[in-house]
Amino acid sequence: MEYFAKSVPNGGSKEEQVTLKQHLDDTVECAQDFFEKFGHYFTEKEKAIIIEACRVHDLGKANIVFQSKINKELHVIKTQEIPHGFLSAMTTSPEEFKNHIPEADNDDYKAFYTAVYHLSLIHISEPTRRSY
């Protein structure tokens, strides 16, 4: 199954729908571009944490309930959805996080976890930015 990040734009075709992988890759690339210009304001560890947050911030969208909301071809029994921010935040354990960023400590993991979770809350609380 191919997972998507957002629904098809109004009047758009299914070919315009962005896959979840492409969205996450684009987000990482955007952060890397930002760091090319402004990276001197951040430590290497801070940059690594931000890149990792970008890499996983929407992984919680890879669930059948969310996908059925943005893909009407999927037929799922109506059920309460766990917000994708909760799921995204839980995709990376402290151990896996420290494998990606060996110099990270527990406080860094807490900041990362909070950032991933809150990135999703921004989407939930701003309905004009939601596309599903």
Predicted regions and their residues:
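Generic short alpha-helical segment signal, independent of protein family or function
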Residues: 55, 64, 90-100
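Acidic/histidine metal-binding catalytic segments
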Residues: 38-52, 98-122
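Short coil/turn segments at secondary-structure boundaries
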Residues: 75-83, 107
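Single conserved hydrophobic/aromatic residue that forms the stacking wall/gate
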Residues: 123-132
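An active-site-proximal "capping" alpha-helix that borders the catalytic cofactor pocket
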Residues: 26-32, 83-97
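Histidine-centered divalent metal-coordination motifs
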Residues: 23, 57, 84, 122-123
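Acidic/His-rich, divalent-metal-binding segments that scaffold phosphate/diphosphate chemistry
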Residues: 1-78
